[in-house]
């Protein structure tokens, strides 16, 4: 069973999100990805945020763990490490060739504009 992690980073009423473009659709989601062999969920979420956004984060707490179509998803509330004040920059997925990258954009998006997003709505009930 595949285990996926995601990160919730909120600053000034905005949430960090990445835009993905897959062969079937384009959508916004939280930074995250799969847990690699020998890696903890916590290590995976820190690595995924760094790969996708170039931000260094620490974990505050686990927000949820749910069953999804592809396996299990665990989401963590994270914060930037002290001294990490740079803006997020688009990273890469090292598992995909350069010409097949799915990451398109990374930025903070206003929470008030995302009330209808099911993933964000779930998070807001847990914060």
Give the residues covered by each predicted segment.
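Conserved hydrophobic "DFG−1" position in protein kinase catalytic cores
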Residues: 9-10, 17, 78, 108
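Unchanged
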Residues: 35-58, 67-119
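C-terminal/domain-terminus segments
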Residues: 124-127
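A short gly/proline-enriched turn/hairpin at secondary-structure junctions
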Residues: 29-30
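A conserved beta-turn-beta hairpin within the catalytic core of GNAT-like acetyltransferases
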Residues: 23-26
């Amino acid at each position: 069973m595949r285990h996926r992690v995601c990160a919730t980073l909120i600053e000034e009423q905005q949430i960090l999100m990445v835009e993905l473009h897959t062969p079937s659709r384009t959508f916004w989601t939280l930074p995250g990805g799969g847990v690699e062999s020998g890696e903890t969920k916590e290590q995976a979420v820190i690595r995924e945020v760094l790969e996708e956004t170039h931000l260094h984060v620490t974990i505050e707490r686990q927000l949820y763990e749910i069953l999804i179509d592809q396996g299990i998803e665990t989401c963590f509330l994270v914060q930037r490490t002290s001294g990490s004040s740079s803006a997020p920059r688009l990273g890469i997925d090292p598992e995909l060739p350069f010409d097949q990258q799915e990451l398109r954009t990374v930025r903070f998006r206003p929470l008030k504009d995302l009330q209808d997003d099911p993933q964000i709505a779930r998070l807001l009930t847990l914060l």
